[in-house]
Amino acid sequence: RQRQMCIRDRGNALQNDLTVSGGNENSNYFFSLGHLDQDGVIKNATYERTNARLNYEAKLNDKITLSSKMSYTYTNSNRIQQSSNVSGLMLGLLRTPPDFDGRDYKGTYYSSSGVEYINRGRSYRKSIGQSSNQSYTNPLWTVNEQESSTRVNRVTVTPQITIKPTSWLQLITRGNLDFADDKRTYFFPVGDASSRANGQYQEDVFDIRNSALDVIGKANFLLSDDVNLTTTVGWSY
């Protein structure tokens, strides 16, 4: 019964996409917008992604072409503790007998002296919430009370200029900017198992900035009717 309340038979995913493209003999463009909404086989395990992309190319003349690729991605996910730890889903689930009804996974406990303890976690080994440490966290507590979320915003921009001074020589200069902020939140309420019995809140923020520059030269030589030589040299920073 607890397994059925924690784990679905199958996950669900909904993907929506929109694309627009066009152009003429001197320019072209491509735009796409997409959204993915996904629920995992474990309840409250979610993943959401929204992404947009714009590609553009313009031919200024017979020798110079400009292009740019830009993209934005936002992801928001919540992951359930699954690995081999007493706060995770599987240990509490597999070490709970099937005849134990753990649906009331939290409640109010009264000590022998009448002291009231609200929102106490209730598990097989602490069936009336007599301790702030559940020993093995009730799996329903794991999927409903804990949080392990990640939110990421990412932007990439890749401009490029291509120059063909002659019919056999091509020069490419390409840049890349990659910006991302990654915020991860972990929350274990008071009453969890192990060292987190007193509760734990943790927030990690990563600010990522990457840039690159490539300069590439391509040359094509016709040595004879049967032999063709193509050479490529480049520099990256």
Regions found by a protein language model. Name each.
Residues 1-4, 41-45, 51, 55-154, ...:
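Surface-exposed loop/interface segments of Gram-negative outer-membrane beta-barrel transport/assembly proteins
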Residues 165-167:
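Long hydrophobic segments that form regular secondary structure
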Residues 157-163, 177:
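Alpha-helical support elements that line or immediately flank enzyme active sites
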Residues 8-52, 63-64, 155:
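Outer-membrane beta-barrel translocator/receptor signature
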Residues 22-24, 35, 58, 70, ...:
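Residue-level signature of outer-membrane beta-barrel architecture
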